Amino acid sequence: MFARAVSRKTMTGLLAGSRVLLASQFTMADRQVHTPLEPVQRQKYANNENLLKDHVEKIDPEVFNIMKNEKSRQRRGLELIASENFTSKAVMDALGSAMCNKYSEGYPGARYYGGNEFIDQMEILCQKRALEVFGLDPAKWGVNVQSLSGSPANFAVYTALVGANGRIMGLDLPDGGHLTHGFFTPARKVSATSEFFQSMPYKVDAQSGLIDYDKLEENAMLFRPKVLIAGVSCYARHLDYERFRKIATKAGAYLMSDMAHISGLVAAGLIPSPFEYSDVVTTTTHKSLRGPRGAMIFYRKGVRSVNAKGVETLYDLEEKINSAVFPGLQGGPHNHTIAGIAVALKQCLSEDFVQYGEQILKNAKTLAERLKKHGYSLATGGTDNHLLLVDLRPIGVEGARAEHILDLAHIACNKNTCPGDVSALRPGGIRLGTPALTSRGFKEQDFEKVGDFIHEGVQIAKKYNAEAGKTLKDFKAFTATNEQFKQEVAELAKRVEEFSGKFEIPGNDLF
């Protein structure tokens, strides 16, 4: 009624006055709304600096220097962490593109925001390439490329197929499995997968280091998991996917294969593929696949089974998995990452990528043989893939101590439990992988030298092991203060740097 009682001219004046009043109020309130505990120091940029257009080197030298130092560390050292790699300049271009600016909750053709024409094109292209790389029929397989990394991808699958407090079964972490496969200890549930789902681990044989499939089948029939996981993070042999399939079918479970570590080798057609036998396949995209840090979830479509009467049961995984990813666990996807994955997948379709995969395997076998020549024991006796697990227990050196010494010598690896280890807190070995250095151009003869460097580092650890104290804390304190030790490690580090510096490193030149 108020609007009807006043003229349009009067109303316009009132609204204009209100805007002035509100503007003045907001200006005053704006200075009072934020009351920090300590005064905030504001930086005034010089007139020739543009916050939105200048490069990071000019805008933020502090961050730039840290990135530059990390690049230098990667260049001068030997990256042997099995889950790491060097992605390409083209992938980095995609990660730094305008794709990072866009919000796009939902899926192609069904978004909760506008302006997604090219976002949809990119996601569809990424999905198309993902199926093509692994030789999958789009009528029988689909793929979700929105998961932010491997752990959320696995959790999304459990959420979709198992439900709260449902049962999953994966390889025990100390035996070569992964945290997301349901790891827990007697004291606590370490992973969210063991917190929200019931999990029962299967094991490897303590003597051979190989998965005990007979025991796995026996326990699966007792536990009756909803999802059986065929996946590893430190297992150097091929998985028997056909046996996994038979066990899963017998137990009434879905078979989920986690090929995060080996997906690049599967893409190159060099090792057995899990797709023939699996209902769901998950993978990260940044390990042997050599893409950005992301993940993919592949799921079957079409007919799941046919009973004795010829009645078909269809898969219903697509809706469940997509809904678990969004809106179940995530909001908007990282579109720059999806672009990077698409680029990496195109590279997977090249002959160069196959040659890279072949070299990974050659280098792994070369490193294994070199270390055995130096007298080291390897879990399972060798390797069929990109990694090997060195058992240091026979020489009396803990994995954490070897990792520390090698790190000081610019050789990056990680401590790892070995089959039969009593405590996961004091692992008896180190895990080594060849993808990263293979991406830098290392060949067999180079990995022989790498094996020699590792041997030197471990022998230094062995030399000072007894006098350096009983705990890792004591050991690190000793290595930080003993001058003779520091001199020996510095000499080794210098030779490692000189050797590593001969090889190119992919990506940006400076950072």
Curated annotation (Swiss-Prot):
Pfam families: SHMT
GO molecular function list: glycine hydroxymethyltransferase activity; pyridoxal phosphate binding
Keyword line: One-carbon metabolism, Pyridoxal phosphate, Transferase
EC number: 2.1.2.1
UniProt keyword annotation of Transferase present: yes
Enzyme class, broadest EC rank: transferase
Gene Ontology cellular component annotations, sorted alphabetically: cytoplasm; mitochondrion; nucleus
Keyword set includes Transferase: yes
Residues where N6-(pyridoxal phosphate)lysine is found: 287
InterPro entries per record: PyrdxlP-dep_Trfase, PyrdxlP-dep_Trfase_major, PyrdxlP-dep_Trfase_small, Ser_HO-MeTrfase, Ser_HO-MeTrfase-like, Ser_HO-MeTrfase_PLP_BS, SHMT-like_dom
Listed pathway(s): One-carbon metabolism; tetrahydrofolate interconversion
Essential cofactor(s): pyridoxal 5'-phosphate
GO biological process, any: embryo development ending in birth or egg hatching
Catalysis performed (reactions): (6R)-5,10-methylene-5,6,7,8-tetrahydrofolate + glycine + H2O = (6S)-5,6,7,8-tetrahydrofolate + L-serine
HAMAP family noted in UniProt: SHMT
Assembly and interaction partners: Homotetramer.
PANTHER family according to UniProt: SERINE HYDROXYMETHYLTRANSFERASE, SERINE HYDROXYMETHYLTRANSFERASE, CYTOSOLIC
Its biological purpose: Interconversion of serine and glycine.
Family that this chain belongs to: Belongs to the SHMT family.
Protein name: Serine hydroxymethyltransferase
